[in-house]
Design a protein with these regions (language model features):
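ABC-type ATPase nucleotide-binding domains, specifically the catalytic core motifs of the NBD
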Residues: 16, 56, 89, 93-108, ...
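The feature captures the beta-strand-to-loop junction immediately N-terminal to the Walker
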Residues: 37-39
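Helix-to-loop junction immediately C-terminal to a conserved catalytic motif
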Residues: 52
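Conserved ABC ATPase "signature" region
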Residues: 105-123, 175
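Conserved ABC ATPase signature
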Residues: 127-131, 135
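A short, proline-enriched helix->beta-strand linker immediately N-terminal to the Walker B motif
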Residues: 146-150
Length: 243
């Protein structure tokens, strides 16, 4: 059996007369972390929405685990820059909302385990308005992980946080991925974030977007962005972006 969990072939998308995605093809191995960077407005989020099943391409196909994607499925979860926590539910209730098919006691135990995993033990009964922005992002991450998705689709998940909290969340995500196996597709404007987290970085061209370059990040975790290898990779990616 192929280890290619996601296969994207010839994806093209326009909105009216505006071409946005132009023949994008790539694949993602099971358990691989792929980051996608590109100029603002180039079509990164549109491409991710197509892969996740929220948008239909004009041409091309997306195959997940050998099955052609025709819409969203429970094997993948989207985490975006926009908050998606239910404000009328507690932290624990937010995590339990998507759990089905097990007992209330089992759901509570599972929710509490993931709340602790993201460092929020003791805040189970807190409401979103009582939490900081960084804590809310931890709730979103825990709520995504508690349903045990095979794939995490992440659309600039930490971009609304301040620089220090963004770095903390990157470290938190990396720690969790060392404990649990997930395939990850990350959209980001932050080249250093891509290098810190990903196994591979795809650089997209301006709209209509296509894959302009691919970089393999052959650096062990935990990574030091100040290392000569990381700095060299950063410069190469920025050069592709015209910076």
């Amino acid at each position: 059996m192929s280890d290619k969990q996601i296969v994207v072939e010839g994806i093209t998308k326009s909105f009216g007369t505006l071409p946005v995605v132009d023949g994008v093809s790539f694949d993602v191995r099971d358990g691989e972390f792929v980051a996608i960077v590109g100029p603002s407005g180039c079509g990164k989020s549109t491409l991710l929405n197509i892969i996740a099943g929220f948008e239909r391409p004009d041409r091309g196909t997306v195959t997940i685990d050998g099955v052609r994607r025709t819409g969203p499925s429970r094997n993948g979860i989207m985490i975006s820059q926009h908050g998606s926590v239910f404000p009328w539910l507690t932290v624990q209730e937010n995590l339990m909302f998507g759990l089905r098919g097990t007992s209330q006691a089992d759901n509570t135990e599972l929710a509490d385990r993931y709340i602790a995993m993201v460092g929020l033990a003791g805040f189970e009964t807190a409401y979103p308005h009582e939490l900081s922005g960084g804590m809310l992002k931890r709730v979103e991450l825990a709520r995504a992980l508690v349903v045990k998705p095979e794939i995490l689709y992440m659309d600039e998940p930490f971009s609304a946080l301040d620089a220090l909290m963004s770095l903390r969340m990157q470290n938190e995500l990396r720690r969790i991925l060392d404990e649990e196996r997930h395939t990850v597709l990350l959209i980001t404007h932050d080249v250093e974030e891509a290098i810190f987290l990903a196994d591979r970085v795809l650089v997209l061209s301006p709209r209509p977007t296509a894959i302009q370059a691919t970089f393999h990040v052959d650096l062990p975790h935990p990574r030091k962005l100040s290392s000569p290898q990381a700095q060299s990779l950063r410069e190469a990616i920025l050069k592709e972006l015209g910076l």
